[in-house]
């Protein structure tokens, strides 16, 4: 597992994690709120990576845990997590060698098994940031507007895109710095092969496969109740085959929420590393300044659910600047800044922030906050 900071957590030994609620962000052709729950128990785990180790209290998924997915239009009921019981994180050096989280663990997906591409953290303070090519009215931003906005994101090593429409891949390839890479996405799983053909054409005309950090097939499909784990397997296999034919040999993943992976550990077998979305705001029991500890805990929970075989990258995490409160989670610009600072400090090297700019084309969404997650928007 890749961490920017190595952290010790203490959790009450007899604590029992209550069910979690998670909602996902709207993207094109997606308008549903989802409630997924699981039951976990707390165990203490020590993992290592090279010459550093991490000790944490990681919830382990109970053997009898079952999936509960319901699609509805109401915000899910919120329940506290064990994050409230987690002590303040502190970084520390260590010379102890360990291998429990080594990316050399075998997996069935590909030669990239378990591994996330190497790379550090730029001046942006996190691995990357998500970007949307849609204007306020839902149309496509111009190439010049995309270039101007991407220039503001030069401090991030990775720019995450969700699809191939609006010529977004071409525009971002032209606008990004030579050292930046794109986390590309095939959003429409009904046309995976054609989506990859569009991606390949964009890469051929404006860059090379070296510019692509990872390719994701689908986003939060299990969490949304739109696909089963076995369907995700088929989607990823189709995507991997088409990508290989197009000359791409890098990592292929399917992004879902942390709770969907915990509830469906079969998902661990299909992606080359675990790419999961996790937002403390939707928990409702985490204040903004504790977001980093909460996100790090979800990284640890996913890592545990996957048997320590796969590195974990958070592919969405952030905080809204406007909207209605969700328990103790209060949207505001100052709270957004506090949350982002906390995430960068605790796990920035393992996190892609959500999102660069406000998405005013979206519906108001849960807590009337869906439009207002833009970190660089006023």
Curated annotation (Swiss-Prot):
The active site is at 316 (nucleophile). Pfam families: Glyco_hydro_17. GO terms for biological process: carbohydrate metabolic process; cell adhesion; cell adhesion involved in single-species biofilm formation; cell wall organization; cell-substrate adhesion; cellular response to glucose starvation; cellular response to neutral pH; filamentous growth. Residues 72-93 have a biased composition (Polar residues). The keyword Glycoprotein applies. InterPro entries: Beta-glucan_modifiers (IPR050732), Glyco_hydro_17 (IPR000490), Glycoside_hydrolase_SF (IPR017853). SUPFAM superfamilies: (Trans)glycosidases. GO terms for cellular component: cell surface; extracellular region; extracellular vesicle; fungal-type cell wall; hyphal cell wall; yeast-form cell wall. Induction: Expressed predominantly by the mycelial cells. Also induced during cell wall regeneration and biofilm formation. Repressed by fluconazole. Residues 67-124 are annotated as: Disordered. Belongs to the glycosyl hydrolase 17 family. The presence of the MP65 gene can be used as a diagnostic marker to distinguish C.albicans from other yeast or Candida species by PCR. PANTHER family: FAMILY 17 GLUCOSIDASE SCW10-RELATED, GLUCAN 1,3-BETA-GLUCOSIDASE. Surface mannoprotein required for hyphal morphogenesis, surface adherence, and pathogenicity. Contributes in a high proportion to the carbohydrate component of the matrix due to high levels of glycosylation and may play important roles during biofilm development and maintenance. Acts as a major antigen target of host cell-mediated immune response. Induces extensive T-cell proliferation of human peripheral blood mononuclear cells. This is Cell surface mannoprotein MP65. It comes from Candida albicans (strain SC5314 / ATCC MYA-2876) (Yeast). The gene is MP65.
């Amino acid at each position: 597992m890749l961490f920017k900071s190595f952290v010790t957590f203490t959790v009450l030994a007899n604590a029992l994690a209550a069910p979690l609620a998670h909602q996902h962000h709207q993207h094109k052709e997606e308008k549903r709120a989802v409630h997924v729950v699981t039951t976990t128990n707390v165990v203490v785990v020590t993992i290592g990576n090279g010459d550093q180790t991490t000790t944490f209290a990681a919830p382990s998924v109970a053997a009898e845990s079952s999936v509960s997915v319901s699609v509805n239009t109401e915000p899910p009921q919120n329940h506290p997590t064990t994050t409230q019981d987690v002590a303040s994180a502190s970084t520390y050096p260590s010379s102890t060698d360990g291998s429990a989280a080594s990316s050399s663990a075998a997996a069935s997906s590909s030669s990239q098994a378990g591994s996330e591409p190497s790379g550090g953290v730029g001046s942006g303070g996190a691995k990357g940031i998500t970007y949307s090519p849609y204007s306020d009215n839902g149309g496509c931003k111009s190439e010049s507007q995309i270039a101007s906005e991407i220039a503001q994101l030069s401090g991030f090593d990775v720019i995450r895109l969700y699809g191939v429409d609006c010529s977004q891949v071409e525009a971002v390839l032209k606008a990004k710095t030579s050292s930046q890479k794109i986390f590309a996405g095939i959003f429409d799983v009904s046309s995976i092969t054609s989506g990859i053909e569009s991606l390949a054409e964009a890469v051929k005309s404006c860059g090379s496969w070296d510019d692509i950090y990872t390719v994701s097939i689908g986003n939060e499909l299990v969490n949304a109740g739109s696909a089963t784990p076995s369907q995700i397997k088929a989607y990823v296999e189709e995507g991997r085959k088409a990508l290989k034919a197009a000359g791409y040999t890098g990592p292929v993943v399917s992004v879902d929420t942390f709770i969907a992976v915990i509830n469906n550990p079969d998902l661990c077998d299909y992606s080359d590393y675990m790419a999961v979305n996790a937002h403390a705001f939707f928990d409702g029991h985490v204040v903004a300044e504790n977001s980093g500890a909460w996100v790090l805990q979800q990284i640890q929970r996913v890592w545990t659910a996957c048997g320590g075989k796969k590195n974990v990258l958070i592919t969405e995490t952030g905080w809204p600047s406007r909207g209605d409160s969700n328990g103790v989670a209060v949207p505001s610009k100052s709270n957004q800044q506090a949350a982002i600072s906390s995430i960068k400090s605790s796990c920035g090297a393992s996190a892609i922030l959500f999102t660069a700019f406000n998405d005013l084309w979206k519906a108001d969404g849960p807590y009337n906050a869906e439009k207002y997650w833009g970190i660089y928007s006023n």
